[in-house]
């Protein structure tokens, strides 16, 4: 029987991601950009193989995500690659107990974001004071007021009261620039795109762009994983948006982070969902931690946490555990690169951008300067724990390695050179499917 209860139990079976091969970049006309991306592709697969080789030293069985050989499976009608490669299986999967949660055919289809927005608008139209207790309604009202009255400086709750004061009781119209408009026209005046993006991200428990590889209907990246699960009689739960990048498994306790603002606002309703999915667990929320929790902290073994955050954040959730903080590590050390990256994100795929000087400078700077800098100076808490005595990490940090030595832990350095180029560390690039061990209760006083 296959299961995962603690992510420091001995690893048996592990999924490993996969990126595009160098041939996928043959359409890029500018040789500087094409050659650079081909190099990134080659080195990325080399580093995946290093991960695999290290895991196989510990007799871990490997299952990889799948890549189509046809680049058109990742392109839109204009021939631009819009679907990213399945590099980070953990961002979309999780083994919780003996069930594996993963994307299926209804990924991002089993909810209607427009219907969600319509229901929120309907609640606003009712003008009930009780709406102030619905944080998502308040956030929607604030978004509307941002358009109707820029720079209003109102809080979400105050925005709700302000907008509801615009709405007439009898005819359900609202005042805008001294004119009355039918209430439904608010959908034509206000652009809800950004809000909808946040709602989708919160629903799918993902971060950044909603263009993720599970959305690719031309090719299913989890076919090999699905076949392995079926062959080994592992129950599969599709499209519940549970993953072990936003959730940490510590025996009977599950810890969930907030993906974004909307996720934080909906924390109570999400907690109800999690309690229904996991009735035999205690559900904990990591307040103050947004995005993927595995990029902020790692419970390495019982009693020890490594984090980029303030140790005080863990006093209630992990009482009496040692918390080793490294506030200046991780993304903070590559802020210069991330500014460049945000400026040219994804443009190497776009026809006409091949001669973009910013793009060329970005790629060349990454390959010539940042790759070696990251290898030598940046430590990442996005680590893969093989067992209680062996941890896979991206580099050296004296404080961390001294701590490991006190706990009898051997660090295995696997430098995933393009981790910050692809936004995926060693933990994200893998997903533990099976570990030895049964559920333990590290905080029995909570019952």
Regions found by a protein language model. Name each.
Residues 1-447:
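The feature marks the mature, well-folded catalytic cores of soluble enzymes
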């Amino acid at each position: 029987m296959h299961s995962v209860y603690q992510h420091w139990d001995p690893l048996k079976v592990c999924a490993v991601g996969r990126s595009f091969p160098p041939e996928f970049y043959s359409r890029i006309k500018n040789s500087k950009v094409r050659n650079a991306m081909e190099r990134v592709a080659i080195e990325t697969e080399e580093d995946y193989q290093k991960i695999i080789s290290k895991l196989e030293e510990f007799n871990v069985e490997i299952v990889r995500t799948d890549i189509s050989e046809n680049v058109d499976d990742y392109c839109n009608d204009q021939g631009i690659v819009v679907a990213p490669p399945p590099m980070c299986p953990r961002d979309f999967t999780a083994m919780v107990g003996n069930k594996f949660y993963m994307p299926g055919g209804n990924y991002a289809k089993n909810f209607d974001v427009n219907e969600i927005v319509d229901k929120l608008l309907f609640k606003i139209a009712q003008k009930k004071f009780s709406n102030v207790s619905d944080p998502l309604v308040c956030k929607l009202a604030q978004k509307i007021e941002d358009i109707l009255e820029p720079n209003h400086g109102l809080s979400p709750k105050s925005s709700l009261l302000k907008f509801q004061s615009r709405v007439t009781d009898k005819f359900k119209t609202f005042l805008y620039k001294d004119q009355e408009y039918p209430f439904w026209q608010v959908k034509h005046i206000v652009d809800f795109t950004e809000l909808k993006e946040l709602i989708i991200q919160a629903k799918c428990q993902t971060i950044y762009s909603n263009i993720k590889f599970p959305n690719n209907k031309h090719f299913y990246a989890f076919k090999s994983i699905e076949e392995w699960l079926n062959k080994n009689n592992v129950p599969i739960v599709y499209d519940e948006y549970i993953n072990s990048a936003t959730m940490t498994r510590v025996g009977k306790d599950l810890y969930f982070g907030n993906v974004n603002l909307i996720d934080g606002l909906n924390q109570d309703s999400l907690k109800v969902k999690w309690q229904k999915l996991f009735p035999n667990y205690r559900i904990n929320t990591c307040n103050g931690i947004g995005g993927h929790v595995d990029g902020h902290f790692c419970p390495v073994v019982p009693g020890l946490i490594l984090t980029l955050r303030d140790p005080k954040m863990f006093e209630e959730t992990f009482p009496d555990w040692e918390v080793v903080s490294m506030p200046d590590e991780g993304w903070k050390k590559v802020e210069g690169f991330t500014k460049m990256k945000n400026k040219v994100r994804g443009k190497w795929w776009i026809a006409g951008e091949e001669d973009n000087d910013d793009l060329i400078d970005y790629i060349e700077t990454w390959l010539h300067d940042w790759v070696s800098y990251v290898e030598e100076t940046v430590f990442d808490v996005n680590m893969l724990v093989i067992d209680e005595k062996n941890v896979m990490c991206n580099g050296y940090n004296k404080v961390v390695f001294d701590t490991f030595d006190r706990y009898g832990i051997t660090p295995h350095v696997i430098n995933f050179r393009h981790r910050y180029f692809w936004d995926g560390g060693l933990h994200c690039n893998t997903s533990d499917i099976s570990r030895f061990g049964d559920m333990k209760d590290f905080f029995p006083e909570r019952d």
